[in-house]
Structures are given as structure tokens and as C-alpha cells.
């Protein structure tokens, strides 16, 4: 049996109900702003940074089950210097986002009067008499697709919202002292309406989700989400 059993109190993080009642899970447009991913994934990024801060401030280690040791969580303050981490600890995401969204918004096309010498931009002449659909079709034909983003902070991994949300809750429930069997019951209640997502239904799958969530806390704390 693994030698470490860690149940420590979290200060800032609490279990959350999933939010999938709209197209916000997949839509990259949020309140008129263009994002690299859906707003719900930025919400999860925020919550996992908060978890990292929680672990750091409360000396909650992540268990390395391969090497039988504890890993101290330390959030990269230099990387997250513009996030205002004291607010991440206490603010609701929606309030924080209002002030910080400029860090995550993608550059949008604009009308220009002067051309800048910048290789990051295309300058395209468009006949104003064309229909919008024809303009879009023409631009798509001219510009090669790219996987890069223009925002200052970008999501690097193709996370899925509900599985990430489940990992988040499992980690918190575990540190609230719930057993794996109790967590299975909690999952069945919180995610009972989401038939398209695979919900952990036995203790071994709870363990795998917990370890995956712990790895995500470590990578997020380093600046990779």
C-alpha cells in the first residue's frame, strides 16, 4: 500500500456543479469576444490555478505514486504575474474575467488607414459590393489555416470540459475526506444528466481520474494548461 494518505483542508476551492446549459462549452465567441477555446475552458484554467494556490498555501503535496514521494506544488508567479493571483484565490471567475479578459482575447480583423510593416498581418483588398458570404469564402481561400493563437495567454492542451470538471471535483471531494465509494455516489448525482461523458463508476477509475487531476494541477501551476 502507498505510504502516504493526505487529507488536508482547501481554503479557496469548493466543489462546483457543471455548466453545460448552453453552447458555451464549444463556442469560441463569448459576449462578442473571440477566444482560442470556449469560455468554460478558461473557467477551468482559472479553477486549476486556484487549486495550485490552495495546495501551495496549505502545504498540500501531490503524491508521486511511481517514485513513492511527495511533490510540493508551487505556482509559477512569474508566468502568472498578470493574473493578479490574490484575486484568483478569492474572486468569482466572472468578476475576475471582466478585468482580465484582454489577456485571452484573440486579435480581430479591423479596418486600417495605414499599412504596418508586420509579418503577423495580412492586408487584403475587398470589394465593398461583395456579399459577406463571398468575402468570407474568398478570405478562406487566400489564407492558410494555422494552429497558433494571438492572445497573451493560450490554452495548450485539447482538454474536454466535463472530464476536466470531473477531475476538479474528485480532487476536492478527496480532500474533503470522502471515500472513493462516496465519490462515486457524488459523481452519479452531479453528472447524472450528462450521458455523453464517461463518468468514473468504480474505485480504480476514481483513482485514475484523481491522478490525472493531480498531474493537471502540477502542469497548470507551471504555466501549461
Where in the sequence are the language-model features?
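DNA-contacting interfaces and partner/effector-binding or oligomerization modules
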Residues: 2-150
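K/R-rich mixed-charge low-complexity regions
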Residues: 149-225
